[in-house]
Every structure is written in structure tokens, then in C-alpha cells.
Amino acid sequence: MSEKAYRDAEGLNKSLLVPFMRSPKHYLQELQEPKEATESMNLGTALHAELLRPEVASDIYAVMKKVDKRTTAGKEYAAQFAAENAGKVIINEEQKIALDGMRENAMSHPAARRLIEEATHTEQAMFADYKASGTDHRFTVKAMADGILEGEGIVFDIKTTESATPQEFAKKVRAFRYDIQQVHYTFAATSSGIYVKEFPFIVIENVKPFGVAVYTLDGERIKRTWDEWKQAMEYYAHCHQKQDFSACYSESICELTF
């Protein structure tokens, strides 16, 4: 399944669930006006292509040379490049140098290399029905796993970041709710008949020296995250059934504890 087909398919993914957990109105905002891809995100997409689908990487991204677009030659190059690479992710030459270093170091890391090379499925789209408690209301959940080692019960995800130290990546986990991602993907996978025993994150630095680490998240934390995820899903089911995502924060004065 292509990434575009997956993006267009109906279903609640982690990227929409996280803003919903802030408020239904934030979910609606993200749904109606999704954020534009940043240069860092484009580099991440190119890296995923090189590591997981190298045979079609050239169809996914292209490298644009630095030219002076004020000149006739520069304008001609830019126009031809745009025509030849329509629909692809575009990175620049500096990013390509970083991409090569990231890919090389990822494949030099024993644990990361094993996961990538032994994956039975890569960029695997998964869909499942979530049934709200006490009702017959259902909605579709979706997730796309970077890699699956089906015989070992492993689903893994690749992340790029400036620092892959345990302390800094822990901050990223909290900030971007990678724990919610693990739970959401695990639900989608198990509902699709895929056994999940372990969910490692391959973390690759996008700045020199392009360090690589592989982490799993604390089991006790994930247990608490399951409860948080379930509560959010039940509330989403309520909003989805009523087709009302207008709620935001409390309209009364609230005491803040800290």
C-alpha cells in the first residue's frame, strides 16, 4: 500500500490522536489544516526510503542542486527539476550528505541493522476497528509500522533527532508521545493478527556524528499509557458518534496544581 493511499484512507492515526488528547478542537484543527512538512521531516522520509525501501528510494525523494535561480540557467534547471520530480520529497545537497552518513551509521549498528535486514514487512499499513465500551459504535484505527519481524513478535519504528542520548530521547518520547504511538500501533497490529512482544525505536541523529541508538520504553510506563490511550479512545468514540469535535478547554475557572 502506498503512503499516499494510506494517508487518504479513513482511520484515526497517532498523529491525529495526540492533538485530540489535547482537545477535540485541536484534533479538528489538525485534520482540517495539517502542518506542512519541514526540511527535517523530508530528510526523515528520505532516510526511511533508503533503509526500508532502497529499491524504490529514487521514486520517493530527489536531491536538488544549489543553483542561482536568478540566472537563466538556474531558472531552467529549477523548472526541469520540478517537472521531473513532481510528487517526490525534495532534499538539498547538504541533506544528502547527512542522509548518507545516517544510513551508513544505522547499518553499522548491530541491533539496528538486524532489525532492518530481518524485517519480514516494511512500511506495513494496519487497520482495525475500535468498539466503544457499552455501545455498538465503532470507528477505524490505522497505523503504518516501519518494520515488523513477524516470527519474533517485533514491531519497530525509526526516529530521527538531533541527540540520541537516553536523556534527550526520553524528552522526545514525552514531547511527541511516542508511548502513545507504541500502544496505538500495538493495538492495530494485534487486531490485524500480528503478535507484538517488543517495540524498539531505532533512533538516528540527523547531525554529525550521526550517532545511533536502539531503545525500548519502560514497561511500567507503557501499562499506564494503555489506560490513558483507552480513555482517549472512549472519548473520541463519543465525539465521533455525535460528530461533534467542538470542545476545547473548560469554560469555568479551574485551579491549577503543579
Question: Language-model features: where?
Answer:
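Short acidic (Asp/Glu) and glycine-rich catalytic loops that position anionic groups and cofactors
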Residues: 25-29, 162-165, 207-211
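Coil-to-beta-strand transition motifs
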Residues: 138-142, 149-153, 196, 207-210
